[in-house]
Amino acid sequence: MSDIEQRVKQAVAEQLGIKAEEIKNEASFMDDLGADSLDLVELVMSFENDFDITIPDEDSNEITTVQSAIDYVTKKLG
């Protein structure tokens, strides 16, 4: 597991109150992990803080699964 993957899963676990080891990469934040729209906003803010990146609103709409978050952060960090 990459450092980015581990950190994304940890942020998701803390935000949604679930164990990081139970989070699958293909899991949808809303459908599989029970996140609501406020949780998604807070997750995006957490990713921004944890990785020192900026995620524009139009990009945040594309971050719907754990893997899409990992891919997005990886791309932003280049």
From Swiss-Prot:
SUPFAM superfamilies: ACP-like. It is found in: Cytoplasm. Gene3D superfamilies: ACP-like. 4'-phosphopantetheine is transferred from CoA to a specific serine of apo-ACP by AcpS. This modification is essential for activity because fatty acids are bound in thioester linkage to the sulfhydryl of the prosthetic group. PROSITE patterns: CARRIER, PHOSPHOPANTETHEINE. The modification O-(pantetheine 4'-phosphoryl)serine is found at S37. Keywords: Cytoplasm, Fatty acid biosynthesis, Fatty acid metabolism, Lipid biosynthesis, Lipid metabolism, Phosphopantetheine, Phosphoprotein. GO terms for cellular component: cytosol; membrane. Pathway: Lipid metabolism; fatty acid biosynthesis. Residues 2-77 form the Carrier domain. It holds the Pfam family PP-binding. One of its GO terms (molecular function) is acyl binding. One of its GO terms (biological process) is lipid A biosynthetic process. Its main location: cytoplasm. NCBIfam families: acyl_carrier, PRK00982.1-2, PRK00982.1-3, PRK00982.1-4, PRK00982.1-5. Belongs to the acyl carrier protein (ACP) family. Carrier of the growing fatty acid chain in fatty acid biosynthesis. This is Acyl carrier protein. The lineage of its organism: Bacteria, Pseudomonadati, Pseudomonadota, Gammaproteobacteria, Moraxellales.
